[in-house]
Amino acid sequence: MNIISVGVNHKTAPIEIRERISLSEVQAKEFLSDIISSGIAQEAMVLSTCNRTELYVVPGMSEVTGHYLKEYLISYKNAEKEVRPEHFFNRFYCNTARHLFEVSSATDSLVLGEGQILGQVKNAYRIAVEEQSAGILLTRLCHTAFSVAKKVKTRTRIMEGAVSVSYAAVELAQKIFSNLSMKKILLVGAGETGELAAKHMFQKNARNIVITNRTMSKAEALAEELGTNQVLPFETFRDNLHEFDIIITAVSTKDYVLKAPDMHQSMQKRRLKPVIILDLGLPRNVDPEIRSLQNMFLKDIDDLKHIIDKNLEMRRSELPKVQEIIDEELVGFGQWINTLKVRPTIVDLQSKFLEIKEKELERYRHKVSDEELRRMERLSDRILKKILHHPIKMLKSPVDTADNIPSKVNLVRNIFDLEEQNQLKQ
C-alpha cells in the first residue's frame, strides 16, 4: 500500500505559482470529493496554506503516480499556462511520512519553528475526515505527525525565541521589565507592525496600552480590539511621554517622531525612572541621540535583528534532535505499514484453522454432552492459539525490511495452502 505526496511550497516555486495552485477550504473539499468518487484515490488529504499546497494520496488505480497527480491538480486549477510539473516535489511511501513529520514539526517552514503550521495540518486532516477521504493509512499518518510535533515542542527548543521584529521587541521588554502588566505602554503607529507588537504585548499580560496614530480611527479600532480603549491624539502625544515605561514606535516617516529634547524633558518629569524605547520603524522613528540620556534604553531594528539571528541560530542547533524524533517515529510508522501488508495473510491463516476446528467439532456435536463440547471448544482454541503464535509472530516481526515481506508472506501462504482458502471464499 503506497502513499504519495506531491505539491508546491516555498522551496520549489515562487509565490505567483503557489498562489495559482492554492486551494481554498471549499475548493479542497470539492477536490477531495472528485478524486475519491472518480477512483483516483482511496484516501486523500489537501494541505493548502500561503506557503504550500500539498496532496497526500493513497492511489486508487495503478496508473496514479506522482506525475499523474501533478498534472491532475494543474488541470483542475486550469493553470496549464503558468504551472509546470517541475514546480512540484514528489514523495513516496516513507519519504511521504518523513515530509509530513517535518512539515508538522515546523522544520520545513519558511520561518524555522513557526507555530502555525501544526494547526494548519490538523485543519487539513479535519477536512479529510469530514469528506470521508481519510482512511486507516492517512489517519495513522496524521496522528503520528501530531505526536511528532508534540514531542518536538516538548523535547527541543526549536519553537523558542522570537524570530519576528515585533515579537523580539516584546520579548526584550519582558526581559527588562519582567512583569509587563505593571507597566504603562505607548504604541506610536497602528499599522501592521504596531498592531502585531500590541497583540504580542497583550499576550504577555500587558493591559495598560495607549495607542496614537496619525489616523485616529485606526488607533481607536485597534484599542477597541485589544479592549484598552485608550488613545491619544497624534499631534499632542509628546505632552504625555513622561507617563510611559515602554514606548514602541512603528510609523512610516522621514523625520524622527521622538527627538532627544522630547525625551530629555520627559525624563525630568519622570525623575529618571527607566524607559525602554523600541523603534520598529524603517527609516528609524527615533533620534539615536536619545541613547545618551540617562536611564533611557533605545533599541532599533538592527538591535532586534541581532536577537532574531541568535534565536534562529539556536533553533537551527536543535535540528539534529528533531531529526532523531522524526527517525524514531518513522521506524514505528514503517513497522505499522508492514503489518498492514501481512494482515490479509494473518486473517486467512486464522480463518483456515478456525474452519478446521469448526468442522472437527461438528463431527462430535451429537456424540457428546453440551458441557463436554464447550470443554472441547476451549481446548481447541488454546491449541490453535499456540499453533498460530509462531507463524503470526514471524509475519509481524519488525526486523524485516519491506523487501522481505512478500517472500515471507508467500512462504506462509504456500506452507498452509492459503490460496485454496481464498478460492473457497470466492
Swiss-Prot record:
Gene Ontology process terms (BP): chlorophyll biosynthetic process; protoporphyrinogen IX biosynthetic process from glutamate
Active-site residues from the entry: 50
EC number: 1.2.1.70
Gene3D superfamilies reported for this sequence: Glutamyl-tRNA reductase, N-terminal domain, NAD(P)-binding Rossmann-like Domain
Alphabetical UniProt keywords: Chlorophyll biosynthesis, NADP, Oxidoreductase, Porphyrin biosynthesis
Keyword NADP: yes
SUPFAM superfamilies: Glutamyl tRNA-reductase catalytic, N-terminal domain (SSF69742), Glutamyl tRNA-reductase dimerization domain (SSF69075), NAD(P)-binding Rossmann-fold domains (SSF51735)
Family indicated by similarity: Belongs to the glutamyl-tRNA reductase family.
Quaternary data: Homodimer.
Name of the protein this chain belongs to: Glutamyl-tRNA reductase
Species name: Prosthecochloris aestuarii (strain DSM 271 / SK 413)
Lineage start: Bacteria, Pseudomonadati, Chlorobiota, Chlorobiia, Chlorobiales
Gene this chain is encoded by: hemA
